[in-house]
Protein backbone atom coordinates (compact mmCIF):
# COMPACT_ATOMS: atom_id res chain seq x y z
CA UNK A 1 0.00 0.00 0.00
CA UNK A 2 1.22 3.48 -0.80
CA UNK A 3 2.05 5.56 2.25
CA UNK A 4 5.01 7.07 4.08
CA UNK A 5 8.50 5.62 4.50
CA UNK A 6 10.16 6.39 7.83
CA UNK A 7 13.92 5.86 7.90
CA UNK A 8 15.14 4.96 11.39
CA UNK A 9 18.36 6.62 12.54
CA UNK A 10 18.11 5.17 16.04
CA UNK A 11 15.62 7.35 17.91
CA UNK A 12 13.64 5.80 20.73
CA UNK A 13 10.63 7.68 19.29
CA UNK A 14 10.78 6.41 15.69
CA UNK A 15 7.87 4.03 16.20
CA UNK A 16 5.75 6.88 17.51
CA UNK A 17 6.08 8.69 14.18
CA UNK A 18 4.45 5.73 12.45
CA UNK A 19 1.88 5.47 15.20
CA UNK A 20 0.84 9.12 14.93
CA UNK A 21 0.58 9.06 11.13
CA UNK A 22 -1.61 5.96 11.25
CA UNK A 23 -3.84 7.54 13.89
CA UNK A 24 -4.58 10.28 11.36
CA UNK A 25 -5.28 7.75 8.58
CA UNK A 26 -1.91 7.77 6.79
CA UNK A 27 -0.26 4.39 6.24
CA UNK A 28 3.41 4.38 7.23
CA UNK A 29 6.19 1.85 7.62
CA UNK A 30 9.60 1.93 9.28
CA UNK A 31 12.85 0.88 7.64
CA UNK A 32 16.52 1.09 8.51
CA UNK A 33 18.29 4.28 7.43
CA UNK A 34 20.21 2.03 5.01
CA UNK A 35 17.05 0.91 3.19
CA UNK A 36 17.95 0.94 -0.54
CA UNK A 37 16.88 3.98 -2.52
CA UNK A 38 15.54 1.80 -5.33
CA UNK A 39 13.29 -0.05 -2.88
CA UNK A 40 11.94 3.28 -1.64
CA UNK A 41 11.38 4.39 -5.22
CA UNK A 42 9.38 1.22 -5.94
CA UNK A 43 7.06 2.02 -3.04
CA UNK A 44 6.34 5.45 -4.54
CA UNK A 45 5.77 6.97 -1.08
CA UNK A 46 3.81 10.14 -0.56
CA UNK A 47 6.61 11.31 1.69
CA UNK A 48 9.81 10.24 3.45
CA UNK A 49 10.59 11.01 7.10
CA UNK A 50 14.09 10.94 8.58
CA UNK A 51 13.88 10.09 12.28
CA UNK A 52 15.90 11.42 15.15
CA UNK A 53 18.91 9.59 16.53
CA UNK A 54 21.59 9.71 19.26
CA UNK A 55 24.54 10.50 16.99
CA UNK A 56 26.22 13.64 15.70
CA UNK A 57 26.43 14.03 11.93
CA UNK A 58 30.17 14.67 12.34
CA UNK A 59 30.93 11.52 14.34
CA UNK A 60 32.89 8.78 12.63
CA UNK A 61 30.49 5.96 11.87
CA UNK A 62 27.36 8.05 12.38
CA UNK A 63 24.42 6.94 10.20
CA UNK A 64 24.43 8.81 6.88
CA UNK A 65 22.12 8.91 3.90
CA UNK A 66 22.17 10.62 0.50
CA UNK A 67 19.23 12.93 1.11
CA UNK A 68 19.47 14.51 -2.35
CA UNK A 69 18.39 11.16 -3.82
CA UNK A 70 15.43 11.03 -1.45
CA UNK A 71 14.29 14.52 -2.46
CA UNK A 72 14.00 13.27 -6.03
CA UNK A 73 11.45 10.67 -4.92
CA UNK A 74 9.03 12.62 -2.70
CA UNK A 75 8.85 15.40 -0.09
CA UNK A 76 11.14 14.82 2.88
CA UNK A 77 10.70 15.66 6.56
CA UNK A 78 13.60 15.64 9.00
CA UNK A 79 13.09 15.21 12.75
CA UNK A 80 15.91 16.21 15.15
CA UNK A 81 18.93 14.26 13.78
CA UNK A 82 17.03 14.19 10.48
CA UNK A 83 17.10 18.00 10.38
CA UNK A 84 20.82 18.04 11.12
CA UNK A 85 21.51 15.45 8.43
CA UNK A 86 19.56 17.43 5.84
CA UNK A 87 21.46 20.59 6.79
CA UNK A 88 24.85 18.88 6.75
CA UNK A 89 24.37 17.17 3.39
CA UNK A 90 22.69 20.05 1.58
CA UNK A 91 25.41 22.60 2.29
CA UNK A 92 24.34 24.14 5.59
CA UNK A 93 26.27 24.09 8.85
CA UNK A 94 25.71 22.07 12.03
CA UNK A 95 27.65 22.79 15.23
CA UNK A 96 27.79 21.54 18.80
CA UNK A 97 25.44 23.57 21.01
CA UNK A 98 26.99 25.34 23.98
CA UNK A 99 24.03 24.21 26.06
CA UNK A 100 22.16 21.03 25.20
CA UNK A 101 18.41 21.47 24.63
CA UNK A 102 16.61 18.61 26.32
CA UNK A 103 13.05 18.10 27.57
CA UNK A 104 10.22 20.63 27.40
CA UNK A 105 11.02 23.85 25.56
CA UNK A 106 9.21 26.53 23.60
CA UNK A 107 9.63 27.55 19.98
CA UNK A 108 8.33 30.61 18.17
CA UNK A 109 7.23 30.34 14.54
CA UNK A 110 8.06 33.23 12.23
CA UNK A 111 6.23 31.64 9.30
CA UNK A 112 2.80 30.19 10.14
CA UNK A 113 2.13 26.47 9.73
CA UNK A 114 -1.50 25.42 9.46
CA UNK A 115 -2.85 24.20 12.80
CA UNK A 116 0.27 25.16 14.78
CA UNK A 117 0.22 28.22 17.10
CA UNK A 118 2.87 30.92 16.80
CA UNK A 119 4.29 29.86 20.17
CA UNK A 120 4.48 26.13 20.68
CA UNK A 121 5.50 23.85 23.56
CA UNK A 122 7.76 21.08 22.25
CA UNK A 123 9.94 18.18 23.37
CA UNK A 124 13.61 18.47 22.45
CA UNK A 125 16.54 16.09 22.81
CA UNK A 126 19.67 17.25 21.00
CA UNK A 127 23.21 18.48 21.50
CA UNK A 128 23.92 19.72 17.96
CA UNK A 129 22.19 22.69 16.36
CA UNK A 130 21.81 24.17 12.90
CA UNK A 131 23.99 27.27 12.64
CA UNK A 132 23.32 27.97 8.98
CA UNK A 133 20.50 26.63 6.80
CA UNK A 134 21.30 25.25 3.33
CA UNK A 135 20.96 27.60 0.37
CA UNK A 136 17.32 27.99 -0.65
CA UNK A 137 16.08 27.11 2.86
CA UNK A 138 14.40 29.43 5.33
CA UNK A 139 14.47 29.22 9.12
CA UNK A 140 10.79 29.33 10.09
CA UNK A 141 10.98 28.77 13.87
CA UNK A 142 13.46 29.41 16.67
CA UNK A 143 13.79 28.03 20.18
CA UNK A 144 13.94 30.15 23.32
CA UNK A 145 17.64 29.31 23.26
CA UNK A 146 17.84 31.28 19.99
CA UNK A 147 18.62 28.20 17.88
CA UNK A 148 16.81 27.27 14.65
CA UNK A 149 13.94 24.94 15.55
CA UNK A 150 12.47 24.45 12.07
CA UNK A 151 13.40 25.14 8.47
CA UNK A 152 11.72 24.72 5.12
CA UNK A 153 12.96 24.45 1.56
CA UNK A 154 11.71 23.09 -1.75
CA UNK A 155 9.97 19.81 -0.88
CA UNK A 156 11.55 19.70 2.58
CA UNK A 157 10.34 20.40 6.12
CA UNK A 158 12.66 19.88 9.09
CA UNK A 159 12.20 20.38 12.83
CA UNK A 160 14.68 20.24 15.71
CA UNK A 161 12.12 18.76 18.12
CA UNK A 162 9.89 15.68 18.30
CA UNK A 163 6.35 16.32 16.99
CA UNK A 164 5.52 12.64 17.50
CA UNK A 165 5.67 12.63 21.33
CA UNK A 166 2.68 13.54 23.48
CA UNK A 167 4.68 16.26 25.28
CA UNK A 168 4.75 18.35 22.08
CA UNK A 169 1.61 20.45 21.72
CA UNK A 170 0.09 20.41 18.22
CA UNK A 171 2.65 17.83 17.11
CA UNK A 172 -0.06 15.92 15.24
CA UNK A 173 -1.02 19.12 13.42
CA UNK A 174 2.56 19.54 12.25
CA UNK A 175 2.71 15.96 10.97
CA UNK A 176 -0.65 16.46 9.29
CA UNK A 177 0.67 19.62 7.60
CA UNK A 178 3.53 17.58 6.14
CA UNK A 179 1.31 14.63 5.16
CA UNK A 180 -1.56 16.58 3.63
CA UNK A 181 -0.28 20.10 3.07
CA UNK A 182 3.03 19.13 1.46
CA UNK A 183 2.57 15.52 0.36
CA UNK A 184 -1.14 15.67 -0.58
CA UNK A 185 -1.65 12.20 0.91
CA UNK A 186 -5.19 10.86 1.34
CA UNK A 187 -6.22 9.75 4.84
CA UNK A 188 -7.37 6.29 3.73
CA UNK A 189 -5.82 3.99 6.35
CA UNK A 190 -8.81 2.66 8.35
CA UNK A 191 -10.24 -0.64 9.54
CA UNK A 192 -12.35 -1.47 6.44
CA UNK A 193 -9.37 -0.74 4.20
CA UNK A 194 -7.01 -2.74 6.43
CA UNK A 195 -9.39 -5.71 6.37
CA UNK A 196 -9.60 -5.73 2.58
CA UNK A 197 -5.82 -5.43 2.19
CA UNK A 198 -5.00 -8.19 4.68
CA UNK A 199 -7.58 -10.60 3.26
CA UNK A 200 -6.10 -10.19 -0.21
CA UNK A 201 -2.53 -10.52 1.12
CA UNK A 202 -3.46 -13.75 2.92
CA UNK A 203 -5.10 -15.16 -0.19
CA UNK A 204 -2.09 -14.26 -2.33
CA UNK A 205 0.48 -15.67 0.11
CA UNK A 206 -1.27 -18.91 1.03
CA UNK A 207 -2.55 -19.63 -2.45
CA UNK A 208 -5.74 -21.36 -3.59
CA UNK A 209 -5.16 -24.83 -2.12
CA UNK A 210 -2.77 -24.67 0.86
CA UNK A 211 -4.09 -25.00 4.41
CA UNK A 212 -3.01 -23.01 7.47
CA UNK A 213 -2.40 -24.06 11.07
CA UNK A 214 -3.15 -21.35 13.64
CA UNK A 215 -1.86 -21.47 17.18
CA UNK A 216 -4.45 -19.79 19.39
CA UNK A 217 -3.41 -18.32 22.74
CA UNK A 218 -6.74 -17.00 23.97
CA UNK A 219 -5.63 -13.43 23.35
CA UNK A 220 -6.88 -10.77 20.97
CA UNK A 221 -4.09 -11.04 18.40
CA UNK A 222 -4.29 -14.74 17.58
CA UNK A 223 -8.10 -14.63 17.68
CA UNK A 224 -8.19 -11.81 15.12
CA UNK A 225 -5.64 -13.64 12.95
CA UNK A 226 -7.70 -16.85 12.97
CA UNK A 227 -10.90 -14.95 12.17
CA UNK A 228 -9.23 -13.00 9.37
CA UNK A 229 -7.77 -16.14 7.79
CA UNK A 230 -11.10 -17.94 8.10
CA UNK A 231 -12.72 -15.04 6.27
CA UNK A 232 -10.01 -15.08 3.60
CA UNK A 233 -9.61 -18.83 3.06
CA UNK A 234 -12.66 -20.55 4.54
CA UNK A 235 -12.92 -22.53 7.78
CA UNK A 236 -12.12 -25.82 6.05
CA UNK A 237 -8.60 -24.55 5.21
CA UNK A 238 -7.83 -22.88 8.55
CA UNK A 239 -7.08 -25.39 11.30
CA UNK A 240 -6.89 -23.78 14.73
CA UNK A 241 -5.20 -25.40 17.70
CA UNK A 242 -5.74 -24.12 21.22
CA UNK A 243 -3.21 -25.66 23.54
CA UNK A 244 -3.62 -26.06 27.26
CA UNK A 245 0.02 -25.54 28.09
CA UNK A 246 -0.60 -25.47 31.82
CA UNK A 247 0.38 -21.79 31.76
CA UNK A 248 -3.06 -20.25 31.27
CA UNK A 249 -5.08 -18.41 33.89
CA UNK A 250 -7.68 -20.04 36.14
CA UNK A 251 -10.45 -21.79 34.14
CA UNK A 252 -9.24 -20.03 31.00
CA UNK A 253 -8.82 -23.06 28.77
CA UNK A 254 -12.43 -24.24 29.00
CA UNK A 255 -13.97 -20.76 28.74
CA UNK A 256 -11.89 -19.66 25.77
CA UNK A 257 -12.34 -22.92 23.86
CA UNK A 258 -16.11 -22.55 24.16
CA UNK A 259 -15.96 -18.96 22.87
CA UNK A 260 -13.90 -20.07 19.85
CA UNK A 261 -16.54 -22.61 18.90
CA UNK A 262 -19.21 -19.95 19.34
CA UNK A 263 -17.65 -17.58 16.78
CA UNK A 264 -17.28 -20.36 14.21
CA UNK A 265 -13.58 -21.20 14.25
CA UNK A 266 -12.42 -24.65 13.19
CA UNK A 267 -10.60 -25.31 16.47
CA UNK A 268 -9.24 -28.31 18.31
CA UNK A 269 -8.23 -28.26 21.98
CA UNK A 270 -5.04 -30.06 23.00
CA UNK A 271 -3.93 -30.80 26.57
CA UNK A 272 -0.13 -30.57 26.53
CA UNK A 273 0.38 -29.17 30.01
CA UNK A 274 2.65 -32.01 31.13
CA UNK A 275 4.91 -31.59 28.09
CA UNK A 276 5.41 -27.89 28.75
CA UNK A 277 5.98 -28.21 32.47
CA UNK A 278 8.42 -31.05 31.92
CA UNK A 279 10.38 -29.03 29.35
CA UNK A 280 10.50 -26.03 31.69
CA UNK A 281 11.81 -28.03 34.64
CA UNK A 282 15.06 -26.56 35.93
CA UNK A 283 14.90 -23.51 33.66
CA UNK A 284 14.91 -20.11 35.35
CA UNK A 285 16.39 -17.76 32.74
CA UNK A 286 13.56 -15.84 31.01
CA UNK A 287 15.09 -16.11 27.53
CA UNK A 288 15.55 -19.84 28.02
CA UNK A 289 11.93 -20.19 29.14
CA UNK A 290 10.59 -18.23 26.16
CA UNK A 291 12.58 -20.21 23.62
CA UNK A 292 11.72 -23.51 25.29
CA UNK A 293 8.02 -22.67 25.13
CA UNK A 294 8.35 -21.65 21.47
CA UNK A 295 10.05 -24.95 20.67
CA UNK A 296 7.47 -27.07 22.49
CA UNK A 297 4.62 -25.19 20.81
CA UNK A 298 5.97 -26.18 17.41
CA UNK A 299 6.40 -29.79 18.53
CA UNK A 300 2.83 -29.88 19.84
CA UNK A 301 1.45 -28.32 16.67
CA UNK A 302 3.32 -30.85 14.60
CA UNK A 303 1.47 -33.65 16.39
CA UNK A 304 -1.91 -31.93 16.59
CA UNK A 305 -3.13 -32.07 13.01
CA UNK A 306 -3.66 -34.56 10.24
CA UNK A 307 -0.44 -34.58 8.21
CA UNK A 308 -2.37 -35.82 5.20
CA UNK A 309 -3.93 -32.37 4.93
CA UNK A 310 -2.09 -29.88 2.68
CA UNK A 311 -1.05 -27.68 5.62
CA UNK A 312 1.90 -25.58 4.53
CA UNK A 313 1.67 -22.56 6.82
CA UNK A 314 1.77 -21.68 10.50
CA UNK A 315 -0.01 -18.42 11.41
CA UNK A 316 0.88 -16.22 14.36
CA UNK A 317 -0.41 -13.01 15.91
CA UNK A 318 2.86 -11.12 15.86
CA UNK A 319 2.36 -7.34 16.15
CA UNK A 320 4.51 -4.40 15.09
CA UNK A 321 5.73 -3.68 18.66
CA UNK A 322 6.77 -7.36 18.94
CA UNK A 323 8.93 -7.00 15.86
CA UNK A 324 10.34 -3.66 16.99
CA UNK A 325 11.29 -5.02 20.43
CA UNK A 326 13.00 -8.03 18.89
CA UNK A 327 15.11 -6.35 16.21
CA UNK A 328 18.37 -4.50 16.83
CA UNK A 329 18.80 -1.33 14.79
CA UNK A 330 22.12 -0.11 13.44
CA UNK A 331 20.87 3.35 14.27
CA UNK A 332 21.03 2.73 17.98
CA UNK A 333 18.06 0.66 19.17
CA UNK A 334 19.01 -2.49 21.04
CA UNK A 335 17.37 -5.87 21.53
CA UNK A 336 15.21 -5.67 24.64
CA UNK A 337 14.07 -9.30 24.73
CA UNK A 338 13.22 -11.95 22.20
CA UNK A 339 9.52 -12.17 21.55
CA UNK A 340 7.89 -15.59 21.69
CA UNK A 341 6.51 -15.02 18.18
CA UNK A 342 9.90 -14.03 16.77
CA UNK A 343 13.13 -15.09 18.45
CA UNK A 344 11.48 -17.95 20.31
CA UNK A 345 10.83 -19.98 17.18
CA UNK A 346 13.22 -22.75 16.21
CA UNK A 347 15.19 -22.19 13.05
CA UNK A 348 14.11 -25.43 11.40
CA UNK A 349 10.35 -25.04 11.06
CA UNK A 350 8.49 -27.58 9.02
CA UNK A 351 5.91 -24.97 8.01
CA UNK A 352 6.12 -21.56 6.42
CA UNK A 353 5.25 -18.58 8.60
CA UNK A 354 2.34 -16.24 7.95
CA UNK A 355 1.86 -13.19 10.20
CA UNK A 356 -1.11 -11.19 8.87
CA UNK A 357 -1.07 -8.45 11.55
CA UNK A 358 2.70 -8.12 11.80
CA UNK A 359 2.58 -4.47 10.68
CA UNK A 360 -0.29 -3.42 12.98
CA UNK A 361 -0.42 -1.86 16.42
CA UNK A 362 -2.73 -3.28 19.08
CA UNK A 363 -5.52 -0.73 18.65
CA UNK A 364 -5.47 -1.36 14.89
CA UNK A 365 -5.88 -5.09 15.57
CA UNK A 366 -8.87 -4.40 17.80
CA UNK A 367 -10.43 -2.15 15.16
CA UNK A 368 -9.83 -4.91 12.59
CA UNK A 369 -11.46 -7.46 14.90
CA UNK A 370 -14.52 -5.25 15.29
CA UNK A 371 -14.69 -4.92 11.50
CA UNK A 372 -14.61 -8.73 11.31
CA UNK A 373 -17.56 -8.93 13.71
CA UNK A 374 -15.84 -10.23 16.85
CA UNK A 375 -17.67 -9.55 20.14
CA UNK A 376 -16.42 -6.73 22.37
CA UNK A 377 -15.57 -9.02 25.29
CA UNK A 378 -13.08 -10.92 23.11
CA UNK A 379 -11.51 -7.79 21.64
CA UNK A 380 -10.98 -5.98 24.92
CA UNK A 381 -9.37 -8.75 26.90
CA UNK A 382 -6.11 -7.56 28.36
CA UNK A 383 -3.02 -8.63 26.40
CA UNK A 384 -1.69 -12.01 27.48
CA UNK A 385 1.80 -13.18 26.47
CA UNK A 386 2.32 -16.32 24.43
CA UNK A 387 4.55 -17.86 27.13
CA UNK A 388 1.66 -17.29 29.54
CA UNK A 389 2.22 -17.48 33.28
CA UNK A 390 5.72 -18.90 32.73
CA UNK A 391 7.06 -15.35 32.49
CA UNK A 392 4.97 -14.21 35.46
CA UNK A 393 6.49 -16.85 37.70
CA UNK A 394 9.97 -15.43 38.04
CA UNK A 395 12.58 -18.15 38.11
CA UNK A 396 11.76 -21.83 37.73
CA UNK A 397 8.15 -22.74 36.98
CA UNK A 398 6.49 -25.40 39.14
CA UNK A 399 2.90 -26.62 39.52
CA UNK A 400 2.78 -25.24 43.06
CA UNK A 401 3.88 -21.75 41.99
CA UNK A 402 1.48 -21.76 39.05
CA UNK A 403 -1.44 -22.65 41.32
CA UNK A 404 -0.58 -19.79 43.68
CA UNK A 405 -0.32 -17.34 40.79
CA UNK A 406 -3.57 -18.49 39.17
CA UNK A 407 -5.54 -18.03 42.39
CA UNK A 408 -4.03 -14.62 43.13
CA UNK A 409 -4.55 -13.38 39.57
CA UNK A 410 -8.18 -14.51 39.68
CA UNK A 411 -8.78 -12.48 42.86
CA UNK A 412 -7.09 -9.40 41.39
CA UNK A 413 -8.82 -9.42 37.99
CA UNK A 414 -12.20 -10.25 39.54
CA UNK A 415 -11.91 -7.18 41.76
CA UNK A 416 -10.98 -5.00 38.78
CA UNK A 417 -14.08 -6.18 36.92
CA UNK A 418 -16.35 -5.84 39.95
CA UNK A 419 -15.27 -2.23 40.51
CA UNK A 420 -15.49 -1.20 36.84
CA UNK A 421 -11.74 -0.72 36.49
CA UNK A 422 -10.89 -3.50 34.04
CA UNK A 423 -11.68 -1.56 30.85
CA UNK A 424 -9.83 1.52 32.09
CA UNK A 425 -6.58 -0.43 32.22
CA UNK A 426 -4.50 -1.63 29.26
CA UNK A 427 -3.07 -4.64 31.08
CA UNK A 428 -3.21 -5.97 34.63
CA UNK A 429 -1.71 -9.11 36.12
CA UNK A 430 0.14 -10.63 39.05
CA UNK A 431 3.79 -11.64 39.21
CA UNK A 432 5.06 -14.28 41.65
CA UNK A 433 8.50 -13.24 42.85
CA UNK A 434 11.34 -15.71 43.53
CA UNK A 435 11.65 -14.58 47.14
CA UNK A 436 9.89 -15.41 50.38
CA UNK A 437 9.38 -13.22 53.41
CA UNK A 438 8.45 -13.73 57.04
CA UNK A 439 4.88 -12.95 57.99
CA UNK A 440 2.29 -13.51 60.69
CA UNK A 441 -1.05 -15.10 59.85
CA UNK A 442 -3.44 -16.44 62.46
CA UNK A 443 -0.93 -15.94 65.29
CA UNK A 444 1.55 -18.16 63.45
CA UNK A 445 4.82 -17.34 61.74
CA UNK A 446 4.76 -17.79 57.97
CA UNK A 447 7.48 -17.83 55.36
CA UNK A 448 5.73 -17.40 52.03
CA UNK A 449 5.93 -15.80 48.61
CA UNK A 450 5.87 -12.13 47.65
CA UNK A 451 3.33 -11.23 44.96
CA UNK A 452 3.58 -8.13 42.78
CA UNK A 453 0.54 -6.47 41.22
CA UNK A 454 1.00 -4.79 37.84
CA UNK A 455 -1.47 -2.48 36.05
CA UNK A 456 -0.62 -0.10 33.22
CA UNK A 457 -2.31 2.29 30.83
CA UNK A 458 -1.17 2.47 27.22
CA UNK A 459 -2.45 3.03 23.69
CA UNK A 460 -0.23 0.62 21.79
CA UNK A 461 2.15 -1.16 24.20
CA UNK A 462 5.12 0.89 23.00
CA UNK A 463 5.08 3.03 26.13
CA UNK A 464 3.06 2.60 29.32
CA UNK A 465 2.34 4.29 32.65
CA UNK A 466 1.42 2.53 35.88
CA UNK A 467 -2.23 2.89 36.84
CA UNK A 468 -2.84 5.21 39.85
CA UNK A 469 -5.06 3.02 42.02
CA UNK A 470 -6.58 4.55 45.12
CA UNK A 471 -4.77 3.35 48.24
CA UNK A 472 -7.99 1.86 49.59
CA UNK A 473 -8.24 -0.43 46.55
CA UNK A 474 -4.67 -1.64 47.02
CA UNK A 475 -5.30 -2.22 50.72
CA UNK A 476 -8.43 -4.27 50.08
CA UNK A 477 -6.97 -6.34 47.22
CA UNK A 478 -3.85 -7.07 49.26
CA UNK A 479 -6.00 -8.27 52.16
CA UNK A 480 -8.13 -10.42 49.86
CA UNK A 481 -5.10 -12.10 48.30
CA UNK A 482 -3.24 -12.79 51.54
CA UNK A 483 -6.43 -14.16 53.12
CA UNK A 484 -7.65 -16.25 50.17
CA UNK A 485 -4.45 -17.45 48.52
CA UNK A 486 -2.37 -19.95 50.41
CA UNK A 487 1.35 -19.33 49.88
CA UNK A 488 1.34 -15.51 49.69
CA UNK A 489 1.97 -13.32 52.74
CA UNK A 490 3.10 -10.07 51.13
CA UNK A 491 1.74 -8.00 48.21
CA UNK A 492 3.52 -5.11 46.48
CA UNK A 493 2.46 -2.79 43.64
CA UNK A 494 4.76 -2.08 40.68
CA UNK A 495 4.99 1.67 39.94
CA UNK A 496 7.42 1.42 37.01
CA UNK A 497 6.57 2.94 33.65
CA UNK A 498 7.75 1.76 30.22
CA UNK A 499 10.44 2.90 29.71
CA UNK A 500 12.53 2.24 31.77
CA UNK A 501 10.82 -1.08 32.48
CA UNK A 502 8.92 -3.35 30.11
CA UNK A 503 5.28 -4.19 30.82
CA UNK A 504 6.00 -7.84 31.59
CA UNK A 505 8.69 -8.57 34.17
CA UNK A 506 10.34 -11.23 32.00
Curated annotation (Swiss-Prot):
CDD domains: GATase1_GMP_Synthase (cd01742), GMP_synthase_C (cd01997). The keyword RNA-binding does not apply. GO terms for cellular component: cytosol. ATP binds at residues 217-223. Pathway: Purine metabolism; GMP biosynthesis; GMP from XMP (L-Gln route): step 1/1. It catalyses: XMP + L-glutamine + ATP + H2O = GMP + L-glutamate + AMP + diphosphate + 2 H(+). The keyword Nucleotide-binding applies. Keywords: ATP-binding, Glutamine amidotransferase, GMP biosynthesis, Ligase, Nucleotide-binding, Purine biosynthesis. Residues 3-188 form the Glutamine amidotransferase type-1 domain. GO terms for molecular function: ATP binding; GMP synthase activity. Residues 189-381 form the GMPS ATP-PPase domain. Its EC number is 6.3.5.2. Gene3D superfamilies: 3.30.300.10, 3.40.50.880, HUPs. The active site is at 80 (nucleophile), 162, 164. Catalyzes the synthesis of GMP from XMP. PANTHER family: GMP SYNTHASE [GLUTAMINE-HYDROLYZING], GMP SYNTHASE-RELATED. Homodimer. This is GMP synthase [glutamine-hydrolyzing]. The lineage of its organism: Bacteria, Pseudomonadati, Bdellovibrionota, Bdellovibrionia, Bdellovibrionales. The gene is guaA.
Amino acid sequence: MRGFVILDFGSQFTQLIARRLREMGFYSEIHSFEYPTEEIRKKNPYGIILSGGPNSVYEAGSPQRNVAELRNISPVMGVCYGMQLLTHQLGGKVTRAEHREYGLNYVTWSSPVQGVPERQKVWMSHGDVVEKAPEGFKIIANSDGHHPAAMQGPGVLAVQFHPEVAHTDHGMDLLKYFAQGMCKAPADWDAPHIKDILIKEAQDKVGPTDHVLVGLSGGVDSTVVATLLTKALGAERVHCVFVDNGLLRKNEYEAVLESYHRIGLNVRGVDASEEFLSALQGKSDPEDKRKTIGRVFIEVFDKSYDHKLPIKWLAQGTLYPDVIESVSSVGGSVTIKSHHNVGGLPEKMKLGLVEPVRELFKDEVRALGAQLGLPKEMLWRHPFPGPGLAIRVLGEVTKEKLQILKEADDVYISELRRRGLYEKIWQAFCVLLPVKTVGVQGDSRTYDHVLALRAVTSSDGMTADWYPFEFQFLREVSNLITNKVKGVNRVVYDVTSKPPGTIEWE
